[in-house]
Curated annotation (Swiss-Prot):
Pathway connected to this protein: Amino-acid biosynthesis; L-methionine biosynthesis via salvage pathway; S-methyl-5-thio-alpha-D-ribose 1-phosphate from S-methyl-5'-thioadenosine (phosphorylase route): step 1/1
Domain of life: Eukaryota
Site-annotated residues for Important for substrate specificity: 179, 235
Organism encoding this protein: Neurospora crassa (strain ATCC 24698 / 74-OR23-1A / CBS 708.71 / DSM 1257 / FGSC 987)
Location(s) in or outside the cell: Cytoplasm; Nucleus
PROSITE patterns reported in the protein's UniProt record: PNP_MTAP_2
Name of protein: S-methyl-5'-thioadenosine phosphorylase
HAMAP family to which the protein is assigned, alphabetical: MTAP
Amino acid sequence: MENLPTTYDGPVHIAVIGGTGLSKLEGYVPVAALNPTTPWGSPSSPLMIFEHNGHAVAFLARHGLYHQLAPHEVPARANIAALRSIGVRTIIAFSAVGSLREEIKPMDFVIPDQIIDRTKGIRPFTFYEGGVVGHVGFADPFDAGLAQVVEKCASAMKGDGVVLHNKGTIICMEGPAFSTRAESHMYRSWGGSVINMSALPEAKLAREAELAYQMICMATDYDCWRDEAGEDVDVAMVMKYMAANGENAKHLVGAVLDELLKQDNSDLVLAKKWQGSAQGAVKFMTKPEGRDPEAMKRVEFLFPGFWEQN
């Protein structure tokens, strides 16, 4: 990585945020390592630019290059802002999850369509504060168009019995400790499908930044609700299944990228659906007399030229 250029002039509209089990893009050649700074600090890792068949994709390691950042320490605002600043408009995020449903087996994949927030306010979770207020819609936290692309690519996975579930509700907990048994049963009663520590505020910030965002989840365990000896989740169990099914994770993400890079998906990749959604929410809230200059600069970083139009 030391010998890679630190600038890249070509368009980069798609990014992959890798979590536990996905640390690189197979078949892609690294061509640059960018180190942008944002008003919210530096991202978790350099933004690695990879090329494949003439197209560029950015890759960011959510927990750092050496997995040194706990879930509540991930600089999610810097991550999302840095990706947008280089031109990214679509994010495919990957996460290992615990299953809260019998039918979602370890090594199965899930395309979630909903989230329940069980974080505790420790993580900074909005771009719009400190003198500029914006209330952004989040009823459907993931991008339905991206979800359809992921589902279409299910055939890229290899092996008997590998299943891709086309919807589900993520419980996003604070961590870093796993759930108690009582909590796990409670989450099941709420209709939770899987549980992780990474979906928020990442998905919410992507929406505030007008990015198309979809998480791909791979189940590694049954959390601790099954009440059977030896089945309670621990790190060794998570890593065991990630190692066993890591190739399928890479195959699936690779197939999704190939599909997104087709011309037919250009509007989807450019997040045309979300353009103006957050800016409108900001524009009509805080009156000019109450706007803090520093907060205005932060919004300008996300949307250059914003205040000239508003």
